[in-house]
């Protein structure tokens, strides 16, 4: 069961701490993503299989809903797409183009099994990847807390947005630095919509935000 109310002090429970521990294992002390081998090992051990569970449905539904209702038929870039959980939740006619990137080659290999004529999955580090095309929606789904300089990364990707394009962000409230990242994003970009979700069973909460460049 999920609600749109959030009580951070009660929701930083076991699930949130466990998720943070996974993220921390993918970091170096300077905050930069660790080698791809770390993420490969986690995917091989099934550490991220929970992203396909019912408890994640509400969060993914918000992101998919933003895409379907705010930019129907648009081109979508999904950074840190993992095994393609977001694309699986998108109707095939809801986008004209979908590109998913992830540091883990094994995750991308799984995602490619659902690839269609309008979608592409690439093994790439989102901190270094340079899009070769422009998009109507760029998604940062539980990614920004893993990056050394999340705001600069978002700024770089925004240059690949079409006019009127959107940035979609999902952050687990238990993830270290998430509140600061969200505050800085709200200062730099216009908030189109924001939803706070809490899952009572897993004791975890998220914030899903739709943003656009100022002045558009």
Give the positions of each predicted feature:
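Class I SAM-dependent methyltransferase SAM/SAH-binding core
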Residues: 83-127
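A short acidic, Gly/Pro-enriched loop at the edge of an enzyme's catalytic core
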Residues: 130-138
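Conserved class I S-adenosyl-L-methionine
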Residues: 5-67, 73-82, 175-176
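Conserved beta-strand signature within the Rossmann-like core of class I S-adenosyl-L-methionine
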Residues: 164-172
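A short glycine-rich, Lys/Arg-flanked "PGG" loop and its adjoining helix->strand segment in the class I
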Residues: 152-163
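Core SAM-dependent methyltransferase catalytic element
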Residues: 198-216
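A short SAM/SAH-binding and catalytic strip from SAM-dependent methyltransferases
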Residues: 137-148
């Amino acid at each position: 069961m999920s609600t749109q109310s959030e009580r951070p002090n009660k929701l930083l429970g076991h699930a949130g701490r466990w998720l943070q521990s996974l993220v921390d294992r993918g970091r170096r002390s300077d905050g930069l993503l660790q080698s791809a081998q770390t993420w490969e090992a986690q995917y091989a051990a099934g550490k991220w299989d929970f992203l396909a569970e019912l408890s994640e449905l509400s969060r993914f539904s918000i992101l998919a809903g933003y895409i379907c209702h705010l930019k129907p038929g648009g081109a979508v870039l999904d950074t840190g797409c993992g095994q393609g959980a977001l694309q699986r939740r998108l109707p095939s006619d809801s986008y004209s183009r979908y590109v998913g990137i992830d540091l883990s080659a094994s995750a991308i290999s799984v995602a490619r099994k659902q690839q269609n004529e309008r979608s592409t999955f690439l093994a790439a580090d989102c901190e270094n990847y340079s899009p070769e095309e422009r998009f109507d929606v760029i998604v940062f789904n539980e990614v920004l807390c893993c990056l050394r300089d999340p705001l600069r990364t978002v700024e770089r990707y925004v240059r690949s947005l079409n006019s009127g394009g959107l940035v979609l962000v999902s952050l687990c409230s238990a993830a270290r630095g998430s509140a600061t990242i969200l505050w800085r994003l709200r200062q730099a970009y216009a908030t189109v919509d924001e939803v706070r979700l809490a899952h009572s069973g897993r004791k975890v909460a998220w914030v899903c935000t739709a943003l656009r460049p100022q002045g558009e």
